[in-house]
Regions:
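N-terminal strand-loop-strand
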Residues: 1-16, 28, 43-44, 77
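Nudix hydrolase/Nudix homology domain
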Residues: 11-14, 87-134
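Unchanged
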Residues: 21-46, 54-108
């Protein structure tokens, strides 16, 4: 599983590559753009999905509270090497490919480890509900 490392003061966590969708952009086009911006992967990646949808709703109700909808795709990097990856996104501090058995020890936002470990190609898309990682 390909993840991007992020940091906040005193806290390291991992996210799926991704971000917002620009006006007029399809979800798959946004996915390819984000792979380029965050990981320098310029070629189109074969994708399946969406495979899951997750809400991340901030438990703190305020003007700055967040509600992020994650639309998760599966993809195949086709044997691409990630050694020379250079992110254009200043928030991305690194990246790594994780084996499914290694995800239990990863601070992942949203916390979708169990879903990913159970998911198989061809499974129907699922709504995982509201998941918030602190």
């Amino acid at each position: 599983m390909l993840l991007c490392r992020h940091e906040k003061p005193g806290k390291e966590y991992w996210l799926l590559p991704g971000g917002g969708v620009n006006t007029g952009e399809s979800l798959v086009d946004a996915l390819h753009r984000e792979l380029w911006e965050e990981l320098g992967i310029g070629e189109e990646v074969a994708v399946e999905g969406p495979v899951a949808i997750v809400d991340s709703i901030s438990p703190v109700q305020s003007f700055a509270a967040k509600h992020v909808v994650h639309i998760i795709f599966a993809g195949d990097l086709g044997g691409r090497s990630l050694e020379a990856v250079n992110s254009q996104d200043a928030a991305v501090r690194g990246h790594s490919l994780f084996g499914l058995d290694d995800l239990d020890d990863v601070v992942l936002h949203p916390p979708i480890q169990r879903f990913v470990q159970r998911w198989r190609p061809g499974d129907p898309a699922v709504y995982l509900g509201a998941l918030w990682a602190r």
